[in-house]
């Protein structure tokens, strides 16, 4: 994971943001994305995608156009063919879901999650939209965890069911909402009303202390609210109940999050919506 001092600054229009990420993470992206074998590399150079990846990219460009442009910029910045980056981004949908946790108390809402390897810290400065501080994989346009200058914090899990009408993953809503909104209500309305593949979950907190989550299930989309001040998404009901119980009895700080998730504190991060900051490895990182 990137050190705080190594935060990547991605500014401008989406292609420029992606280019900055691709250039800064060139080595990691090439290690992850370059296909083995001369034939596969030749297909990448020709822009050829298998049918499932082509559909994924088509739906992403249609329903999340800024993130499609981001991918194009990241590929150029890393010196990669776009198909190679698309394959890596699409493959991340099959990663184990991140556990998402939200806690409220004394008018303050915090969210947190476990982080996968290779996560980087980046400062997004989009043209004409909210600035954000994010933890993300360098081959994905949307973060696992982020907070914006308006006081909205978002956490997301991976996951997308094959064969759904829309192939673009729901975790991409995290980037959309951070750029656009300052309240949980506005973010929920966006996620409930736009196409995306089922399978992901998202958590939201805002500076007014509101907390909510949404499960993008196969049959419908369910809004979730905290019970007893705690909300857990991304795991089955039994584990969620166990985590909620641990947090209900704990201080609800970053260490408590990690202990409840059964992870090392360095593998977890939190976001404080009101303070516009991320909490990572014992450090508070201000926007």
Language-model segments: residues:
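Short histidine-centered catalytic/ligand-binding loop motif
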Residues: 171-179
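A contiguous strand-loop segment
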Residues: 25, 44, 62-172, 197-201
């Amino acid at each position: 994971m990137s050190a705080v001092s190594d935060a990547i600054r991605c500014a401008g229009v989406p292609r420029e943001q992606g280019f900055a990420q691709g250039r800064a993470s060139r080595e990691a992206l090439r290690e992850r994305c370059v296909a083995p074998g001369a034939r596969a590399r030749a297909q990448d150079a020709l822009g050829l995608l298998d049918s499932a990846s082509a559909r994924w990219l088509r739906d992403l460009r249609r329903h999340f156009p800024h993130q499609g442009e981001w991918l194009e910029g990241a590929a150029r910045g890393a010196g990669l063919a776009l198909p190679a980056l698309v394959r890596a981004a699409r493959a991340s949908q099959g990663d184990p879901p991140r556990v998402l946790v939200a806690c409220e108390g004394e008018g303050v809402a915090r969210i947190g999650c476990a982080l996968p390897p290779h996560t980087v810290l980046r400062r997004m400065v989009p043209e004409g939209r909210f600035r954000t501080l994010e933890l993300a994989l360098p081959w994905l346009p949307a973060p696992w965890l982020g907070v914006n200058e308006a006081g909205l914090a978002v956490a997301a899990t991976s996951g997308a069911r094959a064969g759904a009408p829309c192939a673009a993953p729901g975790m991409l809503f995290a980037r959309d909402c951070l750029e656009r909104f300052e309240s949980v209500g506005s973010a929920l309305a966006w996620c409930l009303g736009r196409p995306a593949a089922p399978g992901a979950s998202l958590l939201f907190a805002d500076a007014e202390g509101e907390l909510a989550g949404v499960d993008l299930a196969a049959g419908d989309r369910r809004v979730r609210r905290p019970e007893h001040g705690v909300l857990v998404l991304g795991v089955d009901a039994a584990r969620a109940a166990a985590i909620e119980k641990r947090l209900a009895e704990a201080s609800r700080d970053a260490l408590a999050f990690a202990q409840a998730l059964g992870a090392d504190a360095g593998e977890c991060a939190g976001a404080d919506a009101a303070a516009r900051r991320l909490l990572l490895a014992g450090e508070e990182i201000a926007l």
